Design a protein with these regions (language model features):
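Short, well-ordered coil/turn segments that N-cap beta-strands
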Residues: 12-16, 63-66, 96-98, 134-137, ...
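A C-terminal functional module that forms or caps the active site or interfaces directly
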Residues: 217-264, 268-272
Length: 290
């Protein structure tokens, strides 16, 4: 799947992933009104609104971008109907030729980790039949539990030709409370980066490993170091825009071939119509603004 992601990036010339992280406050009133008229002010109504919102954005952007990244928490907050909207979004994006990164940040051990992996990027056996429950192309994984937590995901990736982005240095301000702790003179995030590179050695696509890393745009100097630590790992870069990451800092995350990273933008794209410079589009044309 890493080969497909790179092919999509080369085709579009845009190393961008759109974060499909819908909140009701981002969704134009006319979409909410229509959904609530059909389903009431219910979880089902909210889920219908976010599904229709996502669908319109994807329809307007799918030929401009290589990938999308739905954050599952934004769907889980609406319960089972929200998860149905998540699945519909994943399927629709894949049908449009987009690579889907499920931002699930799972982390556990043994059979629990295997179940997470099977549920999101693998297949589950039900009697004589098999099903791919959510069927994303990549997922994000929390490595805090070590190899016991990550290896079950890697095993499924090998079987299904899928991929991972493992949290290494996250974009949030308090990430340093743990990630910057020094161990034998080196920060923990660097040691995690080395482990990601090691995990990726046996998981190569044509040019890059399908075991990637998450490194925040808010820490460009650390990104520069980690780029060297993980030369064959694709880096998913959150934190650009609303979280403070600057465009000039993004160069550190790429290799000299112009590849090696994909930059996430969520509200900057899906809620573009709320920005002053795109306000002329109005709520009705929100997807055109995106």
């Amino acid at each position: 799947m890493i080969n497909q992601l790179i092919a999509n990036i080369k085709k579009t010339g845009a190393p961008i992933v759109v974060g499909l992280d819908p909140m009701l406050k981002y969704i134009p009133e006319h979409i909410q009104k229509k959904a609530f008229a059909e389903f009431g002010e219910t979880l089902e109504g909210a889920a219908e609104a976010i599904w229709q919102f996502n669908k319109e954005i994807v329809d307007k952007t799918y030929d401009l971008i290589p990938a999308v990244k739905p954050q599952i928490a934004m769907y889980e907050q609406f319960g089972i109907p929200g998860l149905v909207a998540f699945k519909k979004t994943v399927d629709y994006c894949k049908a449009k030729g987009l690579v889907v990164i499920g931002d699930i940040k799972r982390g556990d051990i043994g059979s629990t980790s295997s179940a997470y992996a099977v549920g999101h990027i693998g297949k589950v056996q039900v009697g004589s039949k098999t099903y791919a429950p959510f069927d994303e192309d990549f997922v994000t994984v929390n490595p805090y539990l070590g190899s016991d937590g990550v290896n079950p995901f890697i095993d499924v990736c090998k079987e299904e030709k899928k991929g991972l982005f493992i949290l290494v240095k996250t974009s949030n301000p308090s990430s340093g409370e743990f990630q910057d702790q020094m161990i034998d003179g080196r920060p923990l995030y660097e040691l995690v980066g080395e482990k990601v590179a090691q995990w990726g050695e046996d998981c190569m696509g044509d040019e890059y490993s399908y075991i990637g890393a998450v490194v925040g745009a808010t820490y460009p100097e650390m990104g520069k170091v980690l780029r060297k630590v993980m030369p064959k790992s694709y880096i998913l870069v959150p934190g650009y825009g609303a979280q403070g990451g600057k465009g000039k800092d993004l160069v550190h995350f790429f290799n000299e071939d112009g590849l090696g990273a994909i930059v996430n933008s969520s509200r900057g794209i899906i809620a573009a119509y709320k920005q002053e410079k795109y306000a002329n589009y109005g709520e009705e044309a929100f997807a055109d603004a995106s």
